[in-house]
Swiss-Prot record:
Its main location: membrane. Signal peptide: none annotated. GO terms for cellular component: plasma membrane. The chain crosses the membrane at residues 9-26, 31-48, 69-88, 93-115, 122-144, 154-176, 183-202, 217-234, 247-269, 273-295, 308-330. It comes from Staphylococcus aureus (strain MSSA476). Keywords: Cell membrane, Membrane, Transmembrane, Transmembrane helix. This is UPF0324 membrane protein SAS0317. Pfam families: Cons_hypoth698.
Length: 331
């Protein structure tokens, strides 16, 4: 019995790995490189669920990917941060980033209320839009006690919209006259995922990409204080409602902070850093596959339309406002 359980666990884990690896490699191909590995992974998983059903017998391995590998990926995500660079070179961008995070969450909740959408998904999308997309959503989902299907829907939406917006940014840069500093800063402070920032920022050249990444990593850095604030708010609400559900700091966020400090104070060989970043990406993709397998098409039809409209409106407002601020500061 135990050997059969282990076999089913390994099959479930292998399934998420194969789809993740395929998505990772497919995203390096022309055209698909614009779509992004996250979007590919989630779409394949949802389509698999639709045509083959949820592989219940292999759920232990799939759940392992959606929970533990996701948290491990977020821990390694901290290696992207160098706190000295963000606070030193990117102090002006960091100030904008604070406004971006606050605006994204508040605006998302406001639009969601007008559309009578799901508040939990709106919160996840607000944090994802303001901070760093899928990783941020996955990091705060336990704090909000979000369901896996809501987390998956939010990640799928933000991956899709972020890809579309990054392509729109490149078109705007190609058509209109814009300095590399303005374009890079605008991309960095307003696009959703690091991959989206790399896609759009890289179109403006190496100087634009450098500024874009500095702006984006400032938002990733803000995940640390943001999660602390969210935990305190949820604890306060929990005590007010006399709930016994205690909100604790997720251990993987502590690991995220430790990795950020390690990358700040310790010189890690670039070859090792590249390997760790690849491992982080694969683990994150495996988690996305596992989350995507929990989403049925009827869930998308019933729960995704209003959040999709909400994030589009919020992202347009954020991009417009961010451009005005960046143009004023960098022109």
């Amino acid at each position: 019995m135990a050997s059969l359980k282990n076999k089913h666990f390994m099959i479930g884990l292998t399934l998420t790995f194969i789809v993740a690896l395929f998505s990772f490699l497919a995203a390096k191909l022309p055209i698909l490189d614009k779509v992004g590995a996250l979007t590919i992974a989630i779409l394949i998983a949802i389509l698999y669920r639709h045509f083959r059903g949820y592989p219940e017998q292999y759920s232990s391995g799939i759940t392992f990917s959606s929970k533990y590998l996701l948290r491990f990926a977020i821990i390694l995500y901290g290696l992207k941060l160098n706190i000295f660079d963000i606070i030193g070179q990117g102090s002006r961008l960091l100030a904008i980033d604070v406004g971006v995070v606050i605006f994204s969450i508040v605006m998302m909740l406001f639009v969601n209320k007008l559309l009578h959408g799901d508040k939990n998904i709106a919160l996840l999308l607000g944090v994802g839009t303001g901070v760093c997309g899928a990783a941020a959503i996955a990091a705060v989902a336990p704090i909000f006690k979000s369901r896996e299907k809501d987390t998956a829907i939010s990640i799928g939406i933000i991956a899709l919209i972020g890809t579309i917006f990054s392509l729109i940014y490149t078109a705007i840069y190609a058509i209109f006259s814009m300095t590399t500093n303005v374009y890079g800063a605008w991309s960095g402070v307003s696009l959703h995922e690091i991959a989206h920032v790399v896609l759009a920022g890289g179109f403006g050249g190496s100087d634009a990409l450098k500024i874009a990444l500095l702006g984006k990593l400032g938002r990733v850095f803000l995940l640390i204080p943001l999660t602390i604030v969210l935990i305190l708010i949820m604890r306060f609400r929990s005590s007010e409602s006399s709930s016994n559900g205690r909100i604790s700091i997720p251990y993987f966020l502590i690991g995220f902070v430790i990795m950020a400090l390690v990358n700040t104070y310790v010189t890690i060989p670039s070859a090792l850093l590249n390997i760790l970043n690849t491992v982080s990406t694969i683990c994150l993709l495996m988690a996305m596959v596992a989350l995507g397998l929990n989403v049925a098409f009827k869930d998308l039809k019933n729960r995704a339309l209003k959040p999709l409209m909400t994030i589009i409106i919020t992202s347009i407002c954020l991009s417009s406002l961010a451009f005005i601020v960046v143009h004023w500061l960098y022109s």
